[in-house]
UniProtKB/Swiss-Prot annotation:
It comes from Xenopus tropicalis. Keywords: Activator, Bromodomain, Chromatin regulator, Coiled coil, Differentiation, Meiosis, Nucleus, Repeat, Spermatogenesis, Transcription, Transcription regulation. Residues 1-21, 235-263, 398-425, 576-610, 627-662 are annotated as: Disordered. SMART domains: BROMO. Residues 28-134, 278-385 form the Bromo domain. This is Bromodomain testis-specific protein. Residues 423-448, 829-917 form a coiled coil. Gene3D superfamilies: 1.20.1270.220, Bromodomain-like. Residues 404-418, 630-660 have a biased composition (Low complexity). Residues 584-603 have a biased composition (Basic and acidic residues). Bromo domains mediate interaction with histones that have acetylated lysine residues at specific positions. Bromo domain 1 mediates binding with histone H4 acetylated at 'Lys-5' and 'Lys-8' (H4K5ac and H4K8ac, respectively). The bromo domains also recognize and bind a subset of butyrylated histones: able to bind histone H4 butyrylated at 'Lys-8' (H4K8ac), while it is not able to bind H4 butyrylated at 'Lys-5' (H4K5ac).
């Protein structure tokens, strides 16, 4: 610390603390002061945020040289405590003012965001909650000797003033203070106005009777014609002639005195008085119920700032800005004293209270939001009040008099009726203009509040005009509101009828709608969002740039509207309900299977190219159909291609058979001879489809409406002196070819040879009888069988057999079943022997190749070697299998699967024999260490 700061610190002098002894001897002890000492001060002192306020501010210690220059009236909790102990205060309002001074000093000297300000706000919140529970009437207490405290009733004008001006809300005073929820005021009993006394000429002492709440005694309001019974001391006002002022009349005495005073009145005054009082009482009962509802605990969260009158001393500019203050307590007093003539006077005071809040506070203030909520509650309840019977009766009387006058002559009747209609139209137009003008002015006042200290004259003028017009506008507003409610109900009924007529959308339709929406271009999606937001109220306020839609939550009418729009955008025809939806739903799955097959075949061909001498190159061309896209071709492609992909995994080699066997027979039954289709497919022996050389013009296939065509088989055979190796393991089964021949599909087949020699011939087979298809398949199987004996391929047999098949396709084959079965068994046995020899040779070659690779690449990771050995094991096991034929009488399918699994396990054990499982070793070590611990 520098010398200057030390000198400044030493030069700060604290002023003497505030005095706590009343030298004028005007101090008293009342029930409210006792409550402030024992309840309010005790609660504040025990609060964990009260420590900065318990002692006077030490400016020298805190190095605050300007504190006492800014704060002219310092105050703290210890000073208030001493003043309460020494009976410094003459009334509770002075003590409350000291508490407010302490909080105000904190807000003046410190910044709004400081910690001390937050602590002060919390203390003030507790203070206001305790003040709300303080007794309403201030009663002086006196101490007599050592016997204790005796209370005697002594109500003065000052005590009554304290009851009226007691502060409840600090939210209206400081805008940064958080909103506390304050307990409600006790419910008061309504005071009955003594209107009889107005008309009578008797003295005030003869009829000064009214209802008084038990335990609560009020001072009479001099501005009110009603007279209240006041309990005073011996020094009370001499105008009352009662000998015992503290005596309260019983209920029978009250009614008896009221009856005697009423008997003296004339009959005409009786009649007029009772009619008016009954009619006004019925209307004001509803207003009183509205007031009780607004002051109930239900609305206390946002109604508490309007309970009591704002103290002008706490807000210096409040009296300048608000010329006509109003609050719920004042409205209640006026209601109890019978100052409201009708419902419109009551409504104008309530609306004035809200207008004052809008004028003084900024629009973003929390008090303004509370006022709006409270006004919504009031307007909703006030609109339910039935019409004034006096007004309706006067209108009926006017109508009767006008009709009586108009009935004097026919000519005058016609003119008066036309005049009355014109007057009604003019009056209605005038009312509408006035209503529009008042609404605009009220809107302008609520949106742009007045912050200046001086209230403009225009605002006062608007308020006066508003009070003048409100009686005329009210019936019109009710009519407009009823019409609006009727239109809303009618519209709601119309929408509900529309919802009932719409057919519910199934799950498949919703899924197809989602797929179609995803196909739409970007510029069409904006319309989709607009349709959903316009028809769904819950999504109306959502962000149109990013919206998440759940079809299960949308209305059926919205879904159908979206379906129509999507069909128009995609130019689709509405589909008839049929079983074809299942095929279309597999369209995406088939494309995914196709891509996965391409990837797998590339990987397998790359891995096996180094281990096999004979090489076969296959290419998978894009699937095309001349007449347009065909789902049948795609599904057939996926089913036949799945044979090759699934055969790579020995455990799932039969899944493709089941998938291919589910080909729809009901579609095949509807074949026609008018159109032909070429279906490119993944085929037998690992060869791939190629585009057919000859193209036949044809129409697109419409599933469900058009039939399938006759298919053709276009085969290209290359005589190969070397062994034809399958590109994928397990592709030697004839399941795919059997199904293709069975269903008559077009099969372009390519078998390439390194020598480059190729022979092309095409054969267009018609759909045959199943017996003809089986015999043709047996012949083709023998023709397509690979041979390894010589360097030359004997193709003469294939040519002869194929020429015979061409010649016999249109002729019924009448061969005996025995000769066919013998021929078939001989062909299968021969093929099995050849494959066994092939498997042995390939196994020896692969074993030698694997040994060479292990010697050349010792650094190869062991896991990759294991995977290669497993792949080779699967290849050899599947190559050595016989064809899956239901007619075969040899080894059954279960035995083959068991042998395959044994061979896989043996190969896996051989591959894992030279490896060490480090994970197992680490687990063993971890278990050992755990047991040691």
């Amino acid at each position: 610390m520098s010398m200057s700061s030390r000198h400044l610190h030493s030069s700060i002098v604290n002023p003497p603390p505030p005095e706590y002894i009343n030298r004028k001897k005007t101090g008293r002890l009342t029930n409210q002061l006792q409550y402030l000492e024992k309840v309010v001060l005790k609660a504040l002192w025990r609060h964990h945020f009260s420590w900065p306020f318990q002692q006077p501010v030490d400016a020298a210690k805190l190095n605050l040289p300007d504190y006492y220059q800014i704060i002219k009236n310092p105050m703290d909790l210890s000073t208030i405590r001493k003043r309460l102990e020494y009976n410094y205060y003459s009334k509770a309002l002075d003590c409350i003012q000291d508490f407010n001074t302490m909080f105000t000093n904190c807000y003046i000297y410190n910044k709004p965001g400081d910690d001390i300000v937050v602590m002060s706000q919390e203390l003030e919140k507790v203070f206001m909650e305790k003040i709300a529970e303080m007794p309403h009437e201030e009663i002086e207490l006196s101490v007599v000797g050592n016997r204790g405290v005796k209370s005697r009733i002594k109500i003065s004008a000052v005590a009554a003033e304290v009851c009226k001006k007691k502060m409840v809300s600090q939210k209206m005073h400081r805008r940064t203070f958080p909103c506390p929820v304050i307990a409600m005021m006790p419910k008061r009993t309504t005071l009955v106005p003594l209107s009889v006394i107005r008309s009578s000429t008797s003295s005030h002492s003869a009829s000064s009777v009214s209802k008084v709440n038990k335990g609560i005694k009020r001072k009479a309001d001099t501005t009110t014609p009603a007279v209240s019974l006041i309990a005073t001391s011996c020094e009370s006002s001499p105008t009352l002639s009662e000998p015992k002022p503290n005596k309260i009349l019983s209920g029978t005495e009250k009614t008896r005195s009221a009856e005697t005073s009423a008997v003296d009145l004339p009959d005409s005054q009786h009649h007029i008085h009772f009619i008016k009082s009954n009619q006004i009482c019925e209307q004001l009962k509803h207003c009183n119920n509205i007031l009780n509802e607004m002051m109930s605990k239900k609305h206390a969260e946002y109604a508490w700032p309007f309970y009591k009158t704002v103290i002008p001393t706490s807000l210096l500019d409040c009296s300048d800005a608000i010329k006509h203050p109003m609050d719920l307590a004042t409205i209640r007093d006026k209601m109890e004293n019978g100052l409201y003539k009708d419902t419109q006077d009551f409504a104008s005071d309530v609306r004035l209270m809200f207008m004052n809040s809008y004028k003084y506070n900024p629009p973003d203030n929390e008090v303004v939001n509370m006022a709006r909520k409270m006004q919504d509650v009031f307007e909703g309840m006030f609109a339910k009040i039935p019409d004034d019977p006096l007004a309706t009766q006067s209108m009926v009387e006017r109508y009767k008099t006008s009709t009586e006058e108009s009935s004097s002559s026919s000519s005058s009747e016609q003119s008066s009726s036309s005049d009355s209609e014109d007057e009604r139209a003019q009056h209605l137009a005038l009312l509408q203009e006035q209503l529009r003008a008042v609404q605009e002015q009220l809107k302008a006042l609520t949106e742009t509040p007045i912050f200046s200290k001086i209230q403009p004259k225009s605002a006062v003028g608007v308020y006066d005009k508003y009070k003048q017009w409100v009686k005329c506008i009210e019936p019109m507003g009710k009519l407009l509101k009823r019409k609006k409610n009727y239109d809303a109900k009618k519209k709601k009924l119309h929408v509900s009828d529309e919802e009932e007529d719409v057919k519910p959308m199934s799950y498949d339709e919703k899924r197809q709608l989602s797929l179609d929406i995803n196909k739409l271009p970007g510029e069409k999606l904006g319309r989709i969002v607009h349709i959903i937001q316009s028809r769904e109220p819950s999504l109306k306020d959502s962000n149109p740039n990013e919206i998440e839609i759940d079809f299960e939550t949308l209305k059926q009418s919205t879904l159908r509207h979206l379906e129509k729009y999507v069909m128009v955008c995609l130019r689709k025809r509405p589909k008839k309900p049929s079983s074809i939806k299942s095929l279309k739903s597999k369209e995406q799955l088939n494309k995914e299977k196709k891509q996965e097959l391409e990837k797998r075949l590339r990987d397998v061909s790359g891995q096996l190219s180094s281990a096999k001498k004979p090489k076969i190159q296959g290419f998978l061309y894009p699937m095309q159909s001349i007449g347009g896209p065909s789902r049948l071709s795609e599904s057939s492609t996926s089913s036949s291609a799945s044979d090759v992909s699934n055969s790579s995994d020995s455990s799932s080699s039969d899944s493709s058979d089941s998938e291919s066997a589910t080909f729809p027979k009901n579609i095949l039954a509807k074949k026609q001879t008018s159109t032909n289709y070429e279906v490119p497919l993944l085929l037998y022996y690992g060869c791939f489809v190629n585009k057919p050389r000859t193209s036949i013009p044809q129409n697109g296939l419409c599933i469900g409406s058009q039939s399938l065509a006759y298919t053709t088989i276009s085969t290209i055979v290359h005589p190969t002196p070397m062994a034809l190796m399958p590109l994928h393991p397990g592709s030697t089964n004839y399941t795919s070819l059997q199904l293709l021949l069975k269903y008559g599909l077009h099969v372009p087949l390519i078998i390439e040879n390194p020598l480059g020699n190729s022979v092309l011939f095409e054969n267009y087979l018609e759909v045959l009888h199943p017996s003809q298809i089986e015999q043709t398949f047996a012949i083709k199987e023998e023709c397509l069988k690979p041979k390894y004996k010589n360097a030359k391929v004997k193709t003469s047999f294939c040519w002869e057999v194929f020429s015979k098949s061409l010649a016999t396709t249109h002729v019924t084959i009448k061969s005996s079943s025995n000769s066919f079965q013998q021929f078939r068994k001989a062909a299968i046995a021969k093929e099995e022997r050849e494959r066994a020899l092939k498997a042995q040779e390939l196994r020896r070659l692969e074993d030698s190749k694997a040994g060479m690779q292990e010697k050349l690449s010792p650094s190869l990771p062991m896991e990759t070697k294991v995977h290669e050995m497993q792949a080779q094991t699967i290849d050899e096991a599947t190559k050595g299998e016989p064809t899956c034929n239901p007619v075969h009488e040899g080894i059954t399918e279960e035995e083959r699967n068991l042998a395959r699994m044994r061979e896989q396990e043996r190969r896996r054990r051989e591959a894992m024999a030279g490896t060490i499982d480090m994970y197992l070793q680490s687990d063993i070590m971890a278990t050992f260490e755990e047991h040691l611990c």
